[in-house]
Amino acid sequence: MTSSEIAMPGEVKADPAALMASLQLLPSPTPNLEIKYTKIFINNEWQNSESGRVFPVCNPATGEQVCEVQEADKVDIDKAVQAARLAFSLGSVWRRMDASERGRLLDKLADLVERDRATLATMESLNGGKPFLQAFYIDLQGVIKTLRYYAGWADKIHGMTIPVDGDYFTFTRHEPIGVCGQIIPWNFPLLMFTWKIAPALCCGNTVVIKPAEQTPLSALYMGALIKEAGFPPGVVNILPGYGPTAGAAIASHIGIDKIAFTGSTEVGKLIQEAAGRSNLKRVTLELGGKSPNIIFADADLDYAVEQAHQGVFFNQGQCCTAGSRIFVEESIYEEFVKRSVERAKRRIVGSPFDPTTEQGPQIDKKQYNKILELIQSGVAEGAKLECGGKGLGRKGFFIEPTVFSNVTDDMRIAKEEIFGPVQEILRFKTMDEVIERANNSDFGLVAAVFTNDINKALMVSSAMQAGTVWINCYNALNAQSPFGGFKMSGNGREMGEFGLREYSEVKTVTVKIPQKNS
């Protein structure tokens, strides 16, 4: 399911009475949610940090503290790595486990997530500000599908025999890398947790994972489910903490064999440097984006407007895939802007627990201030502010859906990743022009093109310098397809069969035999 597909019949959306009736059938948040898990998870045990320090976890819809969580630092990372290395040692329960049993454990974990789906969605809303229904239908559905997808792969990873010259028998093995350090962001806490651990565990690795300090609660809850599912101690270790301490310790740890990170390009560079300075651990990076969304005049205009709207504003604009550079062909530019503004003005901003809410708060005050500063830069540099542009006068970190027109390529809002509910609409005249401009970016995560001409669509898709290109759709992500960036949007791929390659080593084994026969 994509960001624009919280399925509800059209007649229900159009009829207020039918809408209210349908809301009675929708899933509900867990009332009076109890936060049970606030400690570090090592060796299937809940532990206090060695330092005894804790840090606050807040609700971005109110700005109020929800709880305190134990703060891991280097000493705790050392303990977790030791546990993970022991779990990965030759002869351990995990190393001797049948691949099919690893798959069964992942499937069991998916069952437990399905059982606790409403609780986990409530946690994502409380801690991350996501509208509950979006968390339930999009994030949690993605989590369950990812776990089941990799559960099915576990006993299907295999090598091959190779017909080499001479009297030799040669075959390959796909072996787990070892201990994998993983650092995940705050915009999709539970989904990114699953994107990281599922392929790693499928291949037989062990994991030390650090959730973002803003949103550790759902990852910690998953620790309880991982233990309940039956994963052996030390296979998954979850350590909440800060990037400069816990994150840096993971990136530079000599006992970690591979690191995977999702976050900013700036931090990604630091992680790659630390990996190189330590033990040349393997690195997968999924970093920032400033993605082009190209709308040709022959596209279905209403559909393109809605897809472009969802492509920017989904998840409060806090998406690395956000289609924030919308290039619109000149002949339909004014009409596209008009309809986009009308749609943005209809967007409902409110409590994440209100079922009619489309947009919740930004994650924290720092991000809120950054977005407003970039909006002001757009005004100062001459873009036309069509609507929005301000924070909403209420508790929490809410920002109005904002649309800019008359944006040029040299403006900060057209070059920098805003990570907020800000839509920039640029105009173009020719295909060659828009291809060149769309590719004129340090980033290359995703791109999209809307047109009814398949030849035009395929020509643009092949020209885009991006890891994913969507044609007549946006944010159509799934567990089966590889995802990753070109240029400064990262390296390596997550998801799909390609994601398994990032968590395994290929070993060649050659045996001398008396005589080879074909």
From Swiss-Prot:
Tissues in which the UniProt entry reports expression: Found in testis and less abundantly in lung, brain, heart, liver and kidney.
Pfam families: Aldedh (PF00171)
Catalyzed reaction equations: retinal + NAD(+) + H2O = retinoate + NADH + 2 H(+); all-trans-retinal + NAD(+) + H2O = all-trans-retinoate + NADH + 2 H(+); all-trans-13,14-dihydroretinal + NAD(+) + H2O = all-trans-13,14-dihydroretinoate + NADH + 2 H(+)
Location of the active site: E286, C320
Pathway as given in its UniProt record: Cofactor metabolism; retinol metabolism
Residue sites binding NAD(+) per the record: 184-186, 210-213, 264-266, 366-370, 417
PROSITE patterns cross-referenced by the UniProt entry: ALDEHYDE_DEHYDR_CYS (PS00070), ALDEHYDE_DEHYDR_GLU (PS00687)
SUPFAM superfamilies per record: ALDH-like
Residues annotated with Phosphotyrosine modification: Y168
The keyword Cytoplasm is annotated on this UniProt entry: yes
Keywords: Cytoplasm, Lipid metabolism, NAD, Oxidoreductase, Phosphoprotein
GO CC term (a single one): cytoplasm
Primary location recorded for the protein, binned into one broad class: cytoplasm
Compartments, record wording: Cytoplasm
Marked site (Transition state stabilizer) residue numbers: N187
Subunit structure as annotated in this protein's UniProt entry: Homotetramer.
Family that this chain belongs to: Belongs to the aldehyde dehydrogenase family.
Protein name per the record: Retinal dehydrogenase 2
Organism: Rattus norvegicus (Rat)
